[in-house]
From Swiss-Prot:
Induction: By androgens.
Residue ranges, annotated region (Disordered): 159-199
Disulfide pattern: none
CDD domains found in the cross-reference section: Jacalin_ZG16_like
Signal peptide residue numbers: 1-18
Record's protein name: Prostatic spermine-binding protein
Record field: transmembrane: none
Organism: Mus musculus
Keywords from the named record: Glycoprotein, Lectin, Signal
Length: 199
């Protein structure tokens, strides 16, 4: 059993790295923030040699931590209302040397200078960029990057796991039905369904 756990632990960075374009070596990161709103912008930090040192993403009105390394040379690319990234291209040598974002409104933003191995990714029809993951060399640069794609529903919210969303909604409907049936029973005073974990 211990052997299986050890193998699973050792394999997990490899599995994560398989979804990373560019270089799969370095320290893994995943940018969390989708729960704060839709992706609204990105800030790319560049080195004097124009490779990608680090970046931040903006979800709603909140900026994430810096992934990779800060520099005084950075460029912001802010999305307009109803605008989403639908394609990302890039290139890499030891570090990412360029990133190009294309939006559904036809805007294109390029950071760095394309050199080295080229890559391109898109979520397919009716998909947009939700967040990113990747590998970085601490203090040096971003080495590789991966992309999480999702849909937009009628309310403008991100949907990238429809099966779980439907299951959660079904459970909530069942709880509502149970509460209606038990309307004459004493309420315990807990309002668990309305509480959200803000951690």
């Amino acid at each position: 059993m211990l052997l299986l756990l050890t193998l699973a632990f050792l394999a997990s960075p490899t599995c994560r790295a398989q979804n990373v374009l560019g270089n799969a070596a370095g320290k893994y990161f995943y940018v969390q923030g989708e729960d704060q709103g839709q992706l609204k912008g990105m800030r790319i930090f560049l080195s004097v040699f124009k490779f990608i040192k680090g970046f931040q993403l903006q979800f709603g009105s909140n900026w994430t931590d810096v992934y990779g390394t800060r520099s005084d040379n950075f460029i912001d690319f802010l999305l307009e209302d109803g605008e989403h990234v639908i394609k990302v291209e890039g290139s890499a040598v030891i570090c990412l040397t360029s990133l190009t974002f294309t939006t559904n409104k036809g805007r294109v933003a390029t950071f760095g200078v394309r050199r080295g191995r080229y890559f391109s990714d898109t979520g397919g029809s009716d998909k947009h960029l939700v967040t990113v993951n990747g590998m970085h060399a601490p203090g040096l640069c971003v080495r590789g990057i991966g992309f999480k794609w999702g849909n937009i529903n009628a309310n403008g919210n991100d949907h990238y796991n429809n099966k779980e969303d439907k299951a959660d909604n079904k459970d909530a409907d069942n709880k509502d039905a149970d509460n209606k049936d038990d309307g004459d029973e004493d309420d315990d005073g807990n309002d668990d369904d309305d509480q959200k974990d803000e951690s």
